[in-house]
From Swiss-Prot:
Disulfide bridge positions per record: none
InterPro entries linked: Ribosomal_Su5_D2-typ_SF, Ribosomal_uS5, Ribosomal_uS5_bac-type, Ribosomal_uS5_C, Ribosomal_uS5_N, Ribosomal_uS5_N_CS, Ribsml_uS5_D2-typ_fold_subgr
Name of the encoding gene: rpsE
A GO biological-process term: translation
Assembly description: Part of the 30S ribosomal subunit. Contacts proteins S4 and S8.
Family, as annotated: Belongs to the universal ribosomal protein uS5 family.
Top-rank taxon, per record: Bacteria
Pfam families: Ribosomal_S5 (PF00333), Ribosomal_S5_C (PF03719)
Protein name: Small ribosomal subunit protein uS5
Protein role: With S4 and S12 plays an important role in translational accuracy.
A GO term from the CC aspect: small ribosomal subunit
Residue ranges of domain S5 DRBM in the record: 11-74
Keywords: Ribonucleoprotein, Ribosomal protein, RNA-binding, rRNA-binding
Amino acid sequence: MSKVKKNEEALSEVLVDVNRVTKVVKGGRRFAFSAYVVVGDKAGRVGAGHGKAKEVNEARGKAKQAAKKRMMKVPLYQNRTIHHDVVGKSGAAKVILRRAKAGTGVIAGGSMRAIFDSLGVHDIVAKSIGSTNVYAMISATFDALNKLASPKSIAIRRDKKVHEISIKSYIQVNE
């Protein structure tokens, strides 16, 4: 009996960054390519990965495989935004994610937009502070997404019922 593969066709792939890197050796320079890819199913799962190879397509393939391995599930509110405001940090990069009303759209810059599009978020406001390095911003965004919790998971953790958890008690901005 063969293993059932996950539906890979449903994953969207966004190439966030490609760099040509150089290694200086005795005989001259060796060139390679580095790629950073974000993949997601547009339904609450997203991952990011880095790959390096002598050709761009190989680097992109390695990055996609790494992103699939690092996929994570993010709780979404009404399948369109996040449950509460959250702050993520990575090095000198700081990212603030805020929930938004329906119809607001994705207000985010650069690599954060790629993450939210792959995640399936339709309404969010995001602000990056500090470093605008692609790797740092993506890492900070994933740090913020890891801090998200649904009211159901908070209720389970506190050994309460969902209706006992008020909105104010689980909305917090970690500064």
